């Protein structure tokens, strides 16, 4: 979950936005309630000598959690995401989503999401990606690459579909974070978060400061909080994890939906129009002949 994206927090280097947008042009997540966030700020390079700020114990905790997640051939969990969004009064408002996640490595994923706004469903079976909005009975379908990691990338680039907790689902959660890691230190233990004893670690990577709580015994993430360091408002992003099940048998048919298959089709495409700089140039006008 620390994946080089650290719970999705570190994807700022790819200018990812927090709201989950569906190809149908409707918000699938908290943004549907008006919590649309600005793109994360540009990332920074690690300062010279940053390696001296990397505490071995903190790295050991992150690596152990990554190894536990990567070794699971199947898993399910619940993720509650809370995103702060500026209000007209000044103090931020909070919008939340609750996602029930099931995956089977290397090529199966299901995310059923409730939100402060319309619910959404996402299915991936190794060949096809399906984004379904039950309230509108609209579905977007697209061919998909053969791995969960590649499918998550494709869903984002093609349709702005993004899960803030995607980093617990990738094949190697620790790999990316290590590339831009600027500092990491061990805070101590907590017996308050997640109903168990957790190790608390703070780290900074790719312009994001993260505090994470990881089960001391089972090595599973329980909560993470992040702030983009160049965000002038220092808005907080939080993910709480619960109901972890690793290695359980996944029911046949879990990665498809008959209701979605029967819904009205819409293009699997980015919901926002391309900015002027990315829009194709208008055709040159043809001078009319003088009569």
Each PLM stretch: what is its role?
Residues 174-177:
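Edge strands and adjacent loops of beta-rich recognition modules
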Residues 2-6, 28-39:
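N-terminal acidic, proline/glycine-rich, low-complexity intrinsically disordered segments
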Residues 131-169:
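Acidic/charged, solvent-exposed loop-and-adjacent secondary-structure segments enriched in E/D, K/R, S/T
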Residues 56, 80, 115, 130-131, ...:
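Gly/Pro-enriched, hydrophobic low-complexity segments
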Residues 19-30:
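Bacterial N-terminal signal peptides
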């Amino acid at each position: 979950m620390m994946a080089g994206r650290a719970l999705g927090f570190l994807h700022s280097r790819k200018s990812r936005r927090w709201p989950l947008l569906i190809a149908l042009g409707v918000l699938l997540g908290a943004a549907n309630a008006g919590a649309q966030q600005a793109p994360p700020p540009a990332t920074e390079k690690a300062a010279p000598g940053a390696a001296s700020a990397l505490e071995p114990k903190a790295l050991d905790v992150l690596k152990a959690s990554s190894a536990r997640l990567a070794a699971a051939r199947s898993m399910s969990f619940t993720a509650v995401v809370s995103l702060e969004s500026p209000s007209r009064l000044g103090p931020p408002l909070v919008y939340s989503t609750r996602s029930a996640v099931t995956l089977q490595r290397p090529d199966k994923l299901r995310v059923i999401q409730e939100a402060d706004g319309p619910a959404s469903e996402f299915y991936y079976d190794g060949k096809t990606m399906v984004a379904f909005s039950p309230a509108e009975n609209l579905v977007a379908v697209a061919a998909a690459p053969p791995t969960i990691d590649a499918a998550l990338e494709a869903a984002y680039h093609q349709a702005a579909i993004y899960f803030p907790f995607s980093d617990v689902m990738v094949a190697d959660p620790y790999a990316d974070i290590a590339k831009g890691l600027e500092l990491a230190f061990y805070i101590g233990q907590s017996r308050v978060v997640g109903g168990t004893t957790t190790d608390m670690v703070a780290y900074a990577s790719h312009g994001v400061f993260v505090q994470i709580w990881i089960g001391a015994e089972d090595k599973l993430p329980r909560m993470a909080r992040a702030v983009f360091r160049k965000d002038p408002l220092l808005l907080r992003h939080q993910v709480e994890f619960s109901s972890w099940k690793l290695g359980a048998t996944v029911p046949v048919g879990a990665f498809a939906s008959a209701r979605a298959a029967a819904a009205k089709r819409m293009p699997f495409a980015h919901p926002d129009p391309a900015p002027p700089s990315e829009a194709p140039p208008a055709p040159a006008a043809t001078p009319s002949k003088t009569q």
